[in-house]
From Swiss-Prot:
Its main location: cytoplasm. It is an enzyme of class 2 (transferase). Homodecamer; pentamer of dimers. Binds only one seryl-tRNA(Sec) per dimer. It catalyses: L-seryl-tRNA(Sec) + selenophosphate + H(+) = L-selenocysteinyl-tRNA(Sec) + phosphate. The gene is selA. GO terms for molecular function: L-seryl-tRNA(Sec) selenium transferase activity. The modification N6-(pyridoxal phosphate)lysine is found at residue 295. It is found in: Cytoplasm. The keyword Transport does not apply. It comes from Escherichia coli O81 (strain ED1a). The keyword Metal-binding does not apply. This is L-seryl-tRNA(Sec) selenium transferase. GO terms for biological process: conversion of seryl-tRNAsec to selenocys-tRNAsec; selenocysteine incorporation.
Length: 463
């Protein structure tokens, strides 16, 4: 060991001496004596390693308390941090999909703070069913006979198949064998449910006779899967649920549909592309319809199944139902969200998902122009800050080919170096409330469709 190395080691402080320093008193109060000591020991080991490898002290050795505070502050941050979503994707799967309505947030808080009548019947003091209140709401909205709630739509499809078709065949069009994010594939779900997939037709064309020829004594279901995350165009043919239900009645085989996104209102009345609705399929005679709670419906993550009472009863009594059931927070949020649909005239104001999807390009353009000046003043030395038209997308596999006209603030480096964009995006991800945009075509784009809190946005970006 050289004299210089010994000198560096000698500059490392003892933990007892550090703890006596006044700057560590508040740290010990905030994070606890044990955790502070653990971290100091870890940092001393790191410092010794740096001395050994580089013959120098880490820069933070000049202020141990500041480094401890920084590390413990970062450590204490929640894994689920609020962010400002300016990606241009409204229902961003990686950012949690639908924002919850205030009514849903309040309902969850009440359910968390107090015992609730989750499975308790106040009328006779007996045991109730956790799905009952929501089933009544869903039946009122969709016209179904009964309903069942589980923790997501993948679970809903699994339960639907396992309870009604295990050990038997399910007939599906080849063009509807979808895969969604995370490699979730309909054929794989069928295998897990104990069903045999009987695919019919071709990728682009399936006829009623294809289903008819596939039905045999082992057929349990005719199944439709809404291709919500892709579109086949051109020379195509598919039969709708009403036609398939008529065929199913003739052959005595029930029809079920995995609707995926599941909008409970006609989106075309808001100027958005129309999506098939559960109530339309129920009216057509479909026996079971499954859909998501946290996509176009705008509620919490949940899988919802509506349909005929006898079929729902089979789902409720299946062992998988208990494994897949929703908890009280999910049910509280979903009930509050569904109640908003009872007053459709106020839905676009009170339901955040619909409010964001229906923001006009003109309103967003005005917002972008309002924000451009302070951001240009702050970032103008390095970047050209401009207002640009752009196209938002709905996200989460909903309406995959449709885009919503919007406006963005774009940041273009004066020197044209892409590394500056990466650096800027990384800086914004390190903010107390990270700002998430997207890099495309030599610019960093901030699509303002989902920006409602301008003050917080400016507080972050003007730091």
């Amino acid at each position: 060991m050289t004299t210089e190395t010994r000198s560096l080691y000698s500059q490392l402080p003892a933990i007892d001496r550090l703890l006596r320093d006044s700057s560590f008193l508040s740290l010990r109060d905030t994070y606890g004596h044990t955790r502070v000591v653990e971290l100091l020991r870890q940092m001393l080991d790191e410092a010794r390693e740096v001395i050994r490898d580089s013959q120098t002290l880490p820069a933070w050795c000049e202020n141990w308390a500041q480094e401890v505070d920084a590390r413990l502050t970062k450590e204490a941050q929640s894994a689920l941090r609020p962010v400002i979503n300016l990606t241009g994707t409204v229902l961003h799967t990686n950012l949690g999909r639908a924002l919850q309505a205030e009514a849903a947030v309040e309902a969850v808080m009440k359910a968390m703070r107090s015992p609730v009548t989750l499975e308790y019947d106040l009328d006779d003091a007996g045991r109730g069913h956790r799905d009952r209140a929501l089933a009544q709401l869903l039946c009122r909205i969709t016209g179904a006979e009964d309903a069942c709630i589980v923790n997501n739509n993948a679970a809903a499809v699994l339960l639907m198949l396992a309870a009604t078709a295990s050990g038997k065949e399910v007939v599906v069009s080849r063009g509807e064998l979808v895969e969604i994010g995370g490699a979730f594939r309909i054929p794989d779900v069928m295998r897990q449910a104990g069903c045999t997939l009987h695919e019919v037709g071709t990728t682009n064309r399936t006829h009623a006779n294809d289903y008819r020829q596939a039905v045999n004594e082992n057929t349990a279901l005719l199944m439709k899967v809404h291709t919500s995350n892709y579109s086949i165009q051109g020379f195509t043919k598919a039969i709708d649920e009403a036609e398939l239900v008529a065929l199913g009645k003739e052959l005595d085989v029930p029809v079920v549909t995995d609707l995926g996104s599941g909008s409970l209102v006609d989106l075309s009345q808001y100027g958005l592309p129309k999506e098939p609705m559960p109530q339309e399929l129920i009216a057509a005679g479909v026996s079971l319809v499954s859909f998501s709670g946290d996509k176009l419906l705008g509620g919490p993550q949940a899988g919802i199944i509506v349909g005929k009472k006898e079929m729902i009863a089979r789902l409720q009594s299946h062992p998988l139902k208990r494994a897949l059931r929703a908890d009280k927070m999910t049910l509280a949020a979903l009930e509050a969200t569904l109640r908003l649909y009872l007053h459709p005239e106020a839905l676009s104001e009170k339901l955040p998902t619909l409010r964001l999807l229906t923001r006009s390009a003109e309103v967003i353009q005005i917002q972008a122009q309002r924000l451009q000046a302070p951001l240009a003043a702050h970032y103008g030395a390095e970047f050209a800050v401009q207002v640009m038209p752009c196209l938002s997308q709905i996200g989460s596999g909903s309406l995959p080919v449709d885009r919503l006209p919007s406006a963005a603030l774009t940041f273009t480096p004066h020197d044209g170096r892409g590394s500056h964009l990466e650096s800027l995006a990384a800086r914004w991800r390190e903010l107390p409330v990270p700002v998430i945009g997207r890099i495309y075509d030599g610019r960093l784009w901030l699509d303002l469709r989902c920006l409602e809190d301008e003050q917080r946005f400016l507080e972050m970006l003007l730091k």
